Amino acid sequence: KLAQEGMRFTQAYAGSPVSAPSRACLMTGQHSGHTEVRGNKEYWTDSAPVKYGDNTDFSVVGQHPYSPDHIILPEVLRNNGYTTGLFGKWAGGYEGSVSTPDKRGIDEFYGYICQFQAHLYYPNFLNEYSRKRGDKAVSRVVLEENIKYPMTGKGYEKRTQYSADLIHQKAMQWLDQQQAGKPFVGFLTYTLPHAELVQPEDSLLEGYKKIFFVDKTWGGQPGSRYNATVHTHAQFAAMISRLDQYVGDVMRKLKEKGLEENTLVIFTSDNGPHEEGGADPTFFGRDGK
């Protein structure tokens, strides 16, 4: 419906093949050859481990920070009177760096600081920040139900706090607070259907299991944090439909609040196809657009 009622950009491509530099293009307005962010460099590799239950994670996560000398899109908008929210993946700096959402023009944030962490849908923690609440910095929100069970292997399926749904709920709560006459911009940087192929065992997934009744399996990789799955095509298709439902929720909320005629909605992506986590871009015909 969004495509039918709007304008389609059929020759538009993401700014880079991978997420952090692609997002840097959007945030800085620079070509990928000019922005400082050239890849998905991970800062957790140098950080000390931290325990969440029996699970080991990293004490600092994130990517190369945007330069504080270069003003970025949320800062421009906030400086011009917009309320700003970002819900999903940041990938524009690491925890404690000069470039976290609280320091770069974002009023409300909930999601992942790190693009690598954002590959996992039942994580140990998410990050949050609220200027309205008086928060001083981005902090971690431990997902207490998830950390009762292992990140990988037997028992993982008992984790119940699905990050994509949690992030969408926060985004909708924020959107519901916005009012006509007060400009706002929301960066809803959802991660579906990227990387890990997993979601709640609900009617949406079960429906696709019936469609892809002879499905492709993926057995995982040694040392990988991605769990094996026996329904790669059904998982991927259902994750796309789940994202589609999120978009529908946003459009209905804008209409409900009388904001749809004065709100510009842009749907785009930050990276091209990949085979990570068992994804099958050949089957689904993705070409990076």
Where are these regions (language model features)?
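Active-site segment of extracytoplasmic enzymes that catalyze sulfate/phosphate-ester chemistry
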Residues: K1-I72, V76-Y82, G96, R104-E108, ...
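Conserved residues at the C-terminal ends of beta-strands
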Residues: G15, G88, Y112
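Conserved beta-strand elements of the Class I
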Residues: T83-G85, G186
